[in-house]
């Protein structure tokens, strides 16, 4: 029986993780659940899975949760605050940590798990986007196992040789005969929408992804293809890939989740129905396999698999992310922070859909090149970028 800590338990990935655990109750014990401020859902999860600890970032929400759990006669200990969450991520009794807190908020708890040498199921892409080298170095030092949960990175991981899987962050792709890593993306809900209509896109339209069930922020990122841009940055860190070793292709059906091209002409792809429980189950059981609850792919019902080159006029955020990756860690950190501010503003109807890219671009253009040596540097750049983004919003 393995103890699992779920950072971001009330989010989409967290709920999918609990679903996988339901299918494998004899193998996994929920040790701790961590959320933001969703008291009702956290109380329901605690009632069902009975973790030893539960933590909410919001202090008032944590107090309400403690009252509800006491009324339910549950012995789960309720904690709050960043320090407590970091301690849960690094707890000696935890075997596996699902790192699924969205955004920069997940950075420090995930890093705490890395430093503690845990098996980390990495769903928080911002950890590598903002702290790539720091995370890879710390994982190598502590012996932590980094297993990518994002469907694309998980697909690449599965398509690479075993020796590459065992050297996440420093695998020599060329020596292993790998010529290209191919990231696939659906193109989001506006793949065929007229560019003239982009100014009038609403939050409701942007979060209605055609293939995947995701949270609001990541759904908007998928619509702008910033999500694919962040995945591009993350893939470069995870697989030690140069710009020349990366490729992006739009695949509307989301059946092939990504591919690896080899120098002998082979292309190995990982396929499956678009359901996050598949990569979650893979990382939970690695190197073994467990049931995920996902319906098997029915090839008899597949009518077509199509591929399209990305159009940077339609997806300027994707181009921006690729360029930031070439600039370095300061630029990707700034871009990530700007995008969090811009997407939140769009969801709250403060800016138009097209202004997300304008704000992101303004921040990247105005942030000074700064050296990133540690997490303090990252947090400094993150804060600077957020301030520039908020100022830029006043001018849109």
Curated annotation (Swiss-Prot):
It is an enzyme of class 1 (oxidoreductase). Pathway: Isoprenoid biosynthesis; isopentenyl diphosphate biosynthesis via DXP pathway; isopentenyl diphosphate from 1-deoxy-D-xylulose 5-phosphate: step 1/6. The keyword Metal-binding applies. Mn(2+) binds at residues 150, 152, 231. It comes from the Bacteria. Catalyzes the NADPH-dependent rearrangement and reduction of 1-deoxy-D-xylulose-5-phosphate (DXP) to 2-C-methyl-D-erythritol 4-phosphate (MEP). Belongs to the DXR family. Its cofactor is Mg(2+); Mn(2+). Its EC number is 1.1.1.267. 1-deoxy-D-xylulose 5-phosphate binds at residues 125, 151-152, 186, 209, 222, 227-228, 231. GO terms for biological process: isopentenyl diphosphate biosynthetic process, methylerythritol 4-phosphate pathway involved in terpenoid biosynthetic process. It catalyses: 2-C-methyl-D-erythritol 4-phosphate + NADP(+) = 1-deoxy-D-xylulose 5-phosphate + NADPH + H(+). It holds the Pfam family DXP_redisom_C. NADPH binds at residues 10-13, 36-38, 124, 126, 215. This is 1-deoxy-D-xylulose 5-phosphate reductoisomerase. Keywords: Isoprene biosynthesis, Manganese, Metal-binding, NADP, Oxidoreductase. GO terms for molecular function: 1-deoxy-D-xylulose-5-phosphate reductoisomerase activity; manganese ion binding; NADPH binding.
């Amino acid at each position: 029986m393995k103890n699992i800590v779920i950072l971001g338990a009330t989010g989409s990935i967290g709920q999918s993780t609990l679903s996988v655990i339901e299918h494998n109750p004899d193998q996994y014990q929920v040790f701790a659940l961590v959320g933001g401020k969703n008291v009702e859902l956290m109380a329901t999860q605690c009632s069902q899975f009975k973790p030893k600890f539960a933590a909410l970032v919001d202090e008032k929400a944590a107090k309400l949760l403690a009252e509800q759990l006491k009324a339910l006669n549950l012995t789960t200990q309720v904690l709050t605050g960043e320090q407590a969450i970091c301690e849960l991520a690094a707890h000696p009794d935890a075997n596996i940590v699902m790192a699924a807190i969205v955004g920069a908020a997940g950075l420090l708890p995930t890093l705490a798990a890395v430093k503690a040498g845990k098996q980390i199921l990495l769903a928080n892409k911002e950890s590598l986007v903002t702290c790539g080298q720091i995370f890879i170095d710390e994982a190598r030092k502590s012996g932590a196992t980094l297993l990518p949960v994002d469907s694309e990175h998980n697909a690449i991981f599965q398509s690479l040789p075993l020796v590459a899987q065992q050297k996440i962050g420093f695998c020599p792709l060329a020596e292993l005969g790998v010529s290209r890593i191919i990231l696939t993306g659906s193109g989001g809900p506006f793949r065929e929408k007229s560019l003239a209509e982009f100014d009038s896109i609403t939050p409701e339209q942007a979060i209605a992804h055609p293939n995947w069930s995701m949270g609001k922020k990541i759904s908007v990122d998928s619509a702008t293809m910033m999500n694919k841009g962040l995945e591009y940055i993350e893939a470069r860190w995870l697989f030690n890939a140069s710009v020349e070793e990366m490729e992006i292709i739009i695949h509307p059906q989301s059946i092939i989740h990504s591919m690896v091209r080899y120098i002998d002409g082979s292309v190995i792809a990982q396929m499956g129905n678009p359901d996050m429980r598949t990569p979650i189950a893979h990382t939970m059981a690695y190197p073994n396999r467990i049931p995920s609850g996902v319906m098997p792919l029915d090839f008899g019902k597949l009518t077509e698999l199509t591929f399209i080159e990305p159009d940077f006029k339609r997806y300027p955020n994707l181009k921006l992310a690729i360029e930031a990756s070439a600039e370095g860690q300061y630029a990707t950190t700034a871009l990530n922070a700007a995008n969090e501010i811009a997407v939140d503003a769009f969801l709250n109807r403060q800016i138009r859909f097209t202004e997300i890219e304008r704000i992101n671009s303004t921040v990247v253009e105005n942030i000074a090149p700064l050296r990133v040596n540690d997490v303090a540097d990252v947090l400094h750049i993150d804060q600077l970028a957020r301030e520039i983004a908020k100022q830029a919003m006043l001018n849109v």
